[in-house]
Structures are given as structure tokens and as C-alpha cells.
């Protein structure tokens, strides 16, 4: 999502600064390929190093972890951003069962650093990614923002609910305009290879069985990437 949003903003003339940890949750070659598409060469990237795009003169990139408070605050202090859009998080529901600390570091500590940075360096507008997973055991459909979200069924979902509460608190205390968007399974070009639709297509091409959970009784909504980006921009 961050890749498509950065391109959209750069193409409409905004000054854009992209940040990514480039972790190995999935194949980093895809991450570097996205960056190349945005004019950022892999060989130019180094941790904490600001890189200017060869394709967009209004786009820069830095490899950085959100939990690295010192470097993150240095960036926010130097750039004096009008708005921050936080789409960075440790993703995946099942992965959180085996790697819980990765979710606390990125999704809780990292997001707190974003909030505190916005407070200290006077960023007026914060948009951040929440998730449909916060609805947990809700059985009523369609889901609504008025629904109870107090019963998450994964650590990933719990961190996203926590992010919403933290953003609400900072908005109340410090006047930060914070908007959380509960994304529903985003699909489209350059998407993550661990998502179900990529796995289904890969299995079909390889003439292998498609792995289905919950005896095929599961339902899920999908949202195309262009619609997600349009919603964020608005």
C-alpha cells in the first residue's frame, strides 16, 4: 500500500518521504523491485541513508525501523512534515503466533514513536492503517465502525486495536488529527506473496491443491489497491 500511495502522491506533486525497514517477513527482492519502480536503486540504499528518487524529483526514501526512535525523530525534526501516513506494521495473523515480539516492537512501540513524534514535531494530520481483524469474533455482517471490537483473536488484531486506542488518546490530549482505516484484505499489483489470492494462483499454476481453512466456510472481503489509495488520499 505504501508503494502505491507514495507513487500517487509524488505524481500529483506532493513532497514525499518514504520509510521502510525492508525486513525479511517476505522476499526482500519484491521490496527492492518496488523501490526500483519508484526510482530508488537497491545499491544506493543503506540503513539511515536518505536516497533521492531518479524518477520523481519530489520523492526520497530511507531504510528505517519505526522502533528506532532516535533516527525517526531526527527525520521528523528535519523534514517538518504536514502529514504522516503510517502503513508500516508487522503483518500477518498466523505469523504472530510464532513471532509475538516482532508485533510488539513494530506495531506498538513503533506506532507510539510515530504518535510521540507527531506530538513533538507538530504534525497536524496522521493517517494510519488499522485492520479488519479487529472485528475478531463478531458474527454480524456487514461490519460497522459501531461494532464491538473488544475480542481480538490474534496478537496482530490486538496490536491494531491498541493502535486505535493510542491514536484516540493522543488526538484527545494533543489535538492530533488521527484517522485509522480498517483495511479489508488488499489485493492488486505488487502485492504481498503471503496473501491467499497469490497462494491460490500459484497453486493453480503448479497444479497443486489449494489450501483452505475452516472447511471452506470462511468469508472474506477484498479491496483493490487503487480503491485503498483513493481512500487514503481523500
State what each model feature region is:
Residues 1-186, 226:
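N-terminal Rossmann-like NAD(P)+-binding domain of SDR-like oxidoreductases, especially those catalyzing
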Residues 140-142, 165-234:
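NAD(P)-dependent short-chain dehydrogenase/reductase
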Amino acid at each position: 500500500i505504501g508503494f502505491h500511495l507514495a507513487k500517487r502522491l509524488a505524481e500529483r506533486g506532493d513532497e514525499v518521504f518514504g520509510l521502510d525497514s525492508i525486513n525479511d517477513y517476505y522476499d526482500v527482492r519484491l521490496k527492492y523491485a518496488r523501490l526500483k519502480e519508484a526510482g530508488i536503486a537497491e545499491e544506493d540504499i543503506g540503513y539511515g541513508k536518505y536516497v533521492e528518487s531518479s524518477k520523481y524529483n519530489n520523492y526520497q526514501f530511507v531504510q528505517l525501523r519505526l522502533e528506532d526512535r532516535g533516527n525517526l525523530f531526527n527525520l521528523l525534526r528535519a523534514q517538518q512534515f504536514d502529514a504522516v501516513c503510517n502503513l508500516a506494521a508487522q503483518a500477518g495473523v498466523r505469523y504472530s503466533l510464532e513471532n509475538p515480539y516482532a508485533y510488539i516492537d513494530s506495531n506498538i512501540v513503533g506506532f507510539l514513536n510515530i504518535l510521540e513524534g507527531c506530538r513533538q514535531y507538530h504534525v497536524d494530520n496522521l493517517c494510519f492503517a488499522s485492520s479488519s481483524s479487529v472485528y475478531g469474533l463478531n458474527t454480524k455482517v456487514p461490519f460497522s465502525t459501531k461494532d464491538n471490537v473488544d475480542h481480538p483473536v490474534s496478537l496482530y488484531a490486538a496490536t491494531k486495536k491498541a493502535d486505535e486506542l493510542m491514536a484516540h488518546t493522543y488526538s484527545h490530549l494533543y489535538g492530533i488529527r488521527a484517522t485509522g482505516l480498517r483495511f479489508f484484505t488488499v489485493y492488486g499489483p505488487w502485492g504481498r506473496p503471503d496473501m491467499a489470492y497469490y497462494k491460490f494462483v500459484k497453486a493453480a499454476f503448479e497444479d497443486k491443491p489449494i489450501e483452505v481453512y475452516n472447511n471452506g466456510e470462511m468469508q472474506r472481503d477484498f479491496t483493490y489497491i487503487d480503491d485503498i489509495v483513493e481512500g487514503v488520499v481523500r
